[in-house]
Amino acid sequence: MKKTFIILCLLVMCLMTIAQTPCPQVIPALQEWKGAKGTLCLPAQGSIVINPSDEAALTKTASTLVEDLKELMGWEYTITTGKAKKNDIYLSLSQPDEQLGKEGYTLSIMNKVSIEAPTTQGVFWGTRTLLQMLHHQKAKLAKGTTRDWPEFPNRGFMLDVGRKFFTLDYLKEQIKVLSFYKMNEFQIHLNDNGFPQFFDNDWNQTYAAFRLESERFPGLTAKDGSYTKKEFTELQRMGMEYGVNIIPEIDIPAHSLAFAHYKPEIGSKEYGMDHLDLYKEETYQFVDALLDEYLSGEEPVFIGPDVHIGTDEYNKKEAEQYRYFTDRYLKYVASYGKTPRMWGGLKWLPGKTPVQAEGVTVNAWSFDWVDPEISIQEGYKLINTCDTYLYIVPGAGYYREFLDHQWLYEKWTPWMMNRKQTLPVGTPGVLGGMFAVWNDQCGNGISQQDVHYRSFPAIQVMAERMWKGDNQQTVPFAEFEALCKTMPEAPGVNLLGRIGEETSLLTEEATLNGKESIETSLQEVGYPYTVSFSICPEEKPNISGVLFKGPHSTVYTNWENTGRIAFTRDGYEFAFGSFILPVGQWTDITIKGDWKGTSLYVNGKLQERLEGRKKRVYNPKYNRLESMPIQETLVFPLQYIGDNINGFKGKLKNVKVLQE
């Protein structure tokens, strides 16, 4: 009897196991999943139903979900209020839940989809999970219930837009990407400068930029790319709608050459013009007025809860005055009701002058510059931004081109503050982590999409580690990496230029008269790719005639009347200098691109590779030669063949695109 009972129990357990659906594959992985039997097939036309009492709080979330379902699935959904029916998507706020906190949610898939959370933020995160499930499972959703919440409250990405301009559209797409992976902070580093050795060792010629419109200081704003106050405020509002806190950073008193260019008298004569002079009253008057311009008034420009004042890498000789300056501006920002943030620097600049700690958040970025244990003892809140593990500096040759995704996935946690200090799990004051992209090499040719190629996989793995926390890995890294490669960047975002299968854009011969274009089915193709075509230019081609054009780049023939093939993007120009395209005859051209460079093949043979060119300079500070590698890359434009104003004149055929 006992043996029979045991066998029956085992059979029941097996049947239960078979009946339960496996945990859906999403990034970050779910904290809990209780599978049920069967699947739910959502219709292509359906309803998002909001609990009537939550209509005001959840209508924007529902509207965003409608847009995303259209982008991701091609579905048409409408928004209603009331009681949900079969196959509906139901959104509702629930009672406070200590485990779910401010960002957690419950998602149930039975005869309908129900997303409930104590906060609007939690409901929104639930919609991101649903979208990822739909991407993998299409209309057939595995039934079950998840309770999901983040292990760390602050999960972020910092982008240096001071040394390299990024368009407003790019920043908006980054918000969508971060949100899709439940990363909730986007720090925008608004001012910085290059290294003088690359600009004839002349501070007056050294590149520097401040990216915000300023009415108090006309002429301060960078001329090669900036954001109006209205644009930046709207960007922050968009971030709030997507659950992403935009953290503006105005970096002072170092990295401040843009301000010294505008007002030379506040630049330091002793330590370099990128350092503000901490002993001049004019310096404080300027910084007071600059910060006040964005923090004051009934409708301030900076509308979020946090404002970053930089404070990193000032000369060590001025520790006491630096500490006074830092203390002053932490309190100054706090006086406007904001939470001030700073880069850690008090270990490198120790002294007797007290620096405000209460209510201050510190990016713990360097073992040499910040002591996390002492910082927490003093009352600072910390965000792990360890340079050793979490810095990307494209094309520099120091720090990283790509984060070590496998090591981060398998080993890293936000408790690992630097290469020598790991805090005990659960240490109060550690808020989470943030990785950073620094564009130190001003003018090195790097593109927005080059940066995204590096940052996107980092977003995926950092999202996983900071949401999931110290909980056991869901799958081995190889499986996680494979999952990452199948995931979209976000609904409606394709900065990587993914195209899927090989595509023929133009099979039959086309003749273009220089004033017309052909729109194709693709926008662009990203790394690594091969684009091939046969081309026969007219005897008198247009000068710099557009051959291919896309949202971010353009390819030309007869560049500057030289007969060469060239391309432009991000304000840079690149030409294949070793080949002149013959007119009046057919030539087979192939262009291959990857994240390191771009190759031109002519009639099946490699003609030229754009990679490895360097700008070489002398650095008198260290008495050594230095070099800056130039990034000659191209995400190939495909949206239009030809141009309606100044296009290619001639014949074209056999346009094929392959992405590896």
Regions found by a protein language model. Name each.
Residues 1-24:
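Bacterial Sec-dependent N-terminal signal peptides
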Residues 19-150, 340-349, 356, 493:
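Acidic, contiguous N-terminal accessory segments
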Residues 48, 69, 119, 157, ...:
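Conserved, mostly hydrophobic/aromatic
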Residues 98-274, 282, 291-306, 439-441:
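Feature activates predominantly on carbohydrate-active enzymes
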Residues 155-159, 186-188, 246-250, 307-309, ...:
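Hydrophobic faces of well-ordered beta-strands that scaffold small-molecule active sites
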Residues 259-361, 365-379:
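Active-site neighborhood of glycoside hydrolase catalytic domains
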Residues 355-360, 367-509:
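Flexible, acidic glycine-rich loops studded with aromatic residues
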Residues 499-660:
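Extracellular glycan-associated modules
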